[in-house]
Design a protein with these regions (language model features):
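Carbohydrate-binding surface patches
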Residues: 374-408
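Mixed-charge, low-complexity intrinsically disordered regions
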Residues: 459-535
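Active-site-proximal helices and loops of the catalytic beta/alpha 8
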Residues: 117, 174, 178, 188-270, ...
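The substrate-binding groove and active-site-proximal loops of carbohydrate-active enzymes
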Residues: 16-34, 66-80, 151-166, 183-192, ...
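Conserved, mostly hydrophobic/aromatic
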Residues: 13, 44, 54, 70, ...
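C-terminal beta-strand-rich structural cap/linker in extracellular carbohydrate-active enzymes
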Residues: 427-460
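N-terminal structural segment of carbohydrate-active enzymes
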Residues: 1-99, 104-106, 111-115, 151-152, ...
Length: 535
């Protein structure tokens, strides 16, 4: 498995909508809108994103999935030079680029199909299209028949058994890799594509770029048919997409627990597939419009980021933006967004997702850990992931009241909540009784008990919770330096709590840093540990 994908946090953008392009590609001038993406890079970095999946960017008639030319950037977005600049800036910022590969079908304005329309039987491109024949007309008024994608005759199915077609498509992909340095492809309508084409595509891409990632859009069926050593690396996890939101709406965690265990548990059928996980996208109603209770938004994303696979956030949904299809149209799901004039947004949700992204980056169990269910109830769910000698628990409570969840932990270990201020939970007789507030979650790392500083007096008659407080005294930084904490102050304007500390050997060296930074967990040598630990 490629190392980068196990650490990936995706941000999905539909460029034509995001950039405010006209809905139809009329015969107008080329306009550079795609460079708008560059302005969003600081936001992506703040959110913890390290990979973007961009919807169609190549010349098309309307929505991008009706390609006119695989070798040209859509003139509503810009040109190859502008897109090369965007990809370069993303890569400089440590963000990988995955493009939409629409190879099952093209639009009716695709140049080779236009040749067939103009030259009929005399066109050398008749063999480029699936089941094209002159034995009857098409529903679009052509004097010939052709296969279309799911009956949409504005989307003409390509004949991927034709070597000329395959060479044309691979030539385009090769130019995207060479010119833009792309890191992967999302394959549209993958269930309709000839498997032999995927074999050729895999061989072609991996030869040019061994860590190139291929992910197929699969809605139904056995994911192993497409994601295997001969074809694709991954698929869209629509099974869990549905289970995640409906489990919260129906207050029934058994639904998503069944899917997670079926896919990734002991004997899981997709344990060898690093699935692409999401809670909304350009084709389905936005999460904020689907969830019946907005209080569940944070738990949904906590589940998304802590389950096996690569999490993806659809642009705008990090702020809880709504979006519902209208009259069968997907365009309301694909708005133009301006960072400087956003509608009312949920900043708390965005900060929560940023925190989850950091945990994904730092915690090996969230990258490659196995999956084991610990507690499954209608309104509570606990699962455990382990890798690299570390174990991590996710505990979710969707109820409107607090919950207490009891389960066993490894002897000699305590649990540290790396999502919530590093609270420490100590077991009693090998089990921990974990309190979880309404509509909330905990993400807990198992740590050796002797590594955790405990107060001298602990009242074990109460729930064994030892809050991680910043008290005056000596602390060791994870890099080995020692500092003397003087206390906690507040910023005079923002009122943000700041930890004030100094060098014990040189009192002239004084620092004031955000409390949240002081308490956070960092990845040091492949292991998660507190940034500062009291001596």
């Amino acid at each position: 498995m490629m190392d980068w994908i196990t650490k990936a946090v995706f941000y999905h953008i539909y460029p034509l909508g995001f950039c405010g392009a006209p809905r139809f590609n009329a015969d107008g001038e080329r306009v550079n809108r795609i460079e708008k993406l560059v302005d969003w890079i600081p936001h992506l970095k703040e959110l913890g994103v390290n990979a973007v999946y961009l919807g169609p960017v190549f010349e098309s008639s309307e929505h991008g999935y009706d390609t006119k030319d695989y070798y040209q950037i859509d003139k509503r977005l810009g040109d190859r030079h502008a897109f090369r600049t965007v990809c370069g800036r993303l890569h400089e910022s440590g963000i990988r680029v995955v493009l939409d590969g629409v190879f099952n079908h093209v639009g009716r304005e695709f140049w080779a199909f236009r040749d067939v329309q103009q030259n009929g039987r005399g066109s050398r491109y008749c063999g480029w299209f699936h089941n094209l024949s002159f034995g009857g007309g098409s529903p679009m008024g052509d004097p010939f028949w052709y296969d279309a994608w799911e009956g949409h005759f504005n989307l003409v199915k390509l004949n991927l058994k034709n070597p000329e077609v395959v060479d044309h498509l691979l030539g385009a992909v090769g130019s995207w890799i060479q010119d833009f340095g792309i890191d992967g492809l999302r394959l549209d309508a993958a269930d309709c594509v000839d498997p032999d084409f995927f074999r050729r595509l895999r061989s072609f891409c991996k030869e040019k770029k061994p860590d190139f990632w291929l992910m197929g859009e699969i809605i139904h069926g056995d994911y192993n048919r497409w994601a295997n050593p001969e074809m694709l690396d991954s698929v869209t996890n629509y099974e869990c997409y549905k289970g995640i939101y409906s489990s919260h709406n129906d207050k029934n965690y058994f639904e998503i627990a069944y899917s997670l265990n079926r896919q990734f548990g002991d004997g899981g059928i997709y344990k060898n597939i690093y699935t692409y996980n999401f809670v909304d996208n350009h084709d389905v109603n936005r999460l904020a419009s689907v969830l019946r209770n907005p209080e569940h938004l944070e738990n949904v994303y906590t589940l998304l980021f802590t389950m096996p696979g690569a999490p993806s956030v659809y642009y705008g949904s990090e702020w809880g933006l709504p979006g519902i299809k209208e009259n069968g149209s997907d365009w309301p799901l694909r708005p133009c967004l301006d960072l400087h004039s956003l509608p009312p947004v949920n900043e708390k949700l965005s900060r929560h997702i940023a925190k989850l992204s950091r945990l994904k980056e730092m915690c090996v169990p969230l990258q490659t850990g196995d999956y084991r269910q610990i507690v499954v109830k209608n309104e509570q769910l606990v699962y455990r992931r382990e890798a690299g000698g570390q174990a991590l628990y996710t505990a979710l409570n969707l109820a409107d009241g607090p919950a207490s969840l009891g389960f066993g932990v490894t002897p000699g270990k305590v649990l540290v909540d790396v999502l919530n201020h590093h609270q420490v939970f100590s077991p009693v007789n090998g089990s921990v009784e974990l309190p979880v507030e309404p509509y909330s979650a905990r993400v807990l790392l198992e740590r050796d008990a002797y590594e955790i500083h405990l107060p001298e007096a602990v009242d074990f008659a109460a729930p064994p919770i030892i809050p991680q407080e910043v008290e005056p005294g000596l602390y060791r930084h994870f890099k080995g330096h020692e500092y003397e904490v003087l206390g906690v102050a507040r910023h005079t304007e923002t009122m943000e709590p700041l930890v004030v500390y100094r060098d014990p050997q040189d009192h002239q060296k004084l620092w004031a840093r955000p409390l949240s930074m002081f308490l956070e967990t960092v990845n040091a040598g492949g292991r998660c540990q507190p940034r500062f630990q009291k001596l």
